Amino acid sequence: MANERTFSILKPDATRRNITGAVNAVIEAAGLRIVGQRRIRMTREQAEKFYEVHKERPFFGELVEFMTSGPVVVQVLEGENAVAKYREVMGATNPAQAADGTIRKQFAESVGENTVHGSDSADNARLEIAQFFNDADIAA
């Protein structure tokens, strides 16, 4: 089992409903450590760059609008197999299909407002972390 880092965003629906502490409790209960965390207002440029992989998808504009509609909490999580573990803890993108006990089953309102983002690979985690954090921001 490898100790690794992953990237997380608590999305505007989570900050708007003031549930970031409850989401963090689920993350920590799963054995992941929050080693970097900042509450920010994502700019349009940041959102477009971050979700560039979805640029040609029909939901891209709506996604950018949503991610810039309010504050988000960007995080670096650390633990054994952090990428896979966090994806399991997040649950399916569609909260109706998410397993009981997952973040999205407990807190997400819809597919579009699904509370959290998590990196899908260790390589993407490194890239995503670097967009929002430098080494001095991470206290392992």
Swiss-Prot record:
Predominant location: cytoplasm
SUPFAM superfamilies: Nucleoside diphosphate kinase, NDK (SSF54919)
Protein name according to UniProt: Nucleoside diphosphate kinase
Gene: ndk
UniProt record similarity statement: Belongs to the NDK family.
GO MF annotations, alphabetized: ATP binding; metal ion binding; nucleoside diphosphate kinase activity
Gene Ontology cellular component terms for the protein in this record: cytoplasm
Enzyme class: transferase
Catalytic activity, EC: 2.7.4.6
Cofactors: Mg(2+)
Entry binding sites for ATP: 11, 59, 87, 93, 104, 114
Cited PROSITE patterns: NDPK_LIKE
GO biological process: CTP biosynthetic process; GTP biosynthetic process; UTP biosynthetic process
Protein localization: Cytoplasm
Catalytic activity as recorded in UniProt: a 2'-deoxyribonucleoside 5'-diphosphate + ATP = a 2'-deoxyribonucleoside 5'-triphosphate + ADP; a ribonucleoside 5'-diphosphate + ATP = a ribonucleoside 5'-triphosphate + ADP
Tagged with keyword Cytoplasm: yes
Catalytic site positions: 117
Subunit structure comment from the entry: Homotetramer.
Function according to Swiss-Prot or TrEMBL: Major role in the synthesis of nucleoside triphosphates other than ATP. The ATP gamma phosphate is transferred to the NDP beta phosphate via a ping-pong mechanism, using a phosphorylated active-site intermediate.
Biological classification of the source: Bacteria, Pseudomonadati, Pseudomonadota, Alphaproteobacteria, Hyphomicrobiales
Coiled-coil regions listed: none
Alphabetized UniProt keyword annotations: ATP-binding, Cytoplasm, Kinase, Magnesium, Metal-binding, Nucleotide metabolism, Nucleotide-binding, Phosphoprotein, Transferase
HAMAP family: NDP_kinase (MF_00451)
UniProt KW Nucleotide-binding keyword: yes
Organism: Methylorubrum extorquens (strain CM4 / NCIMB 13688) (Methylobacterium extorquens)
Top-level taxon of the source organism: Bacteria
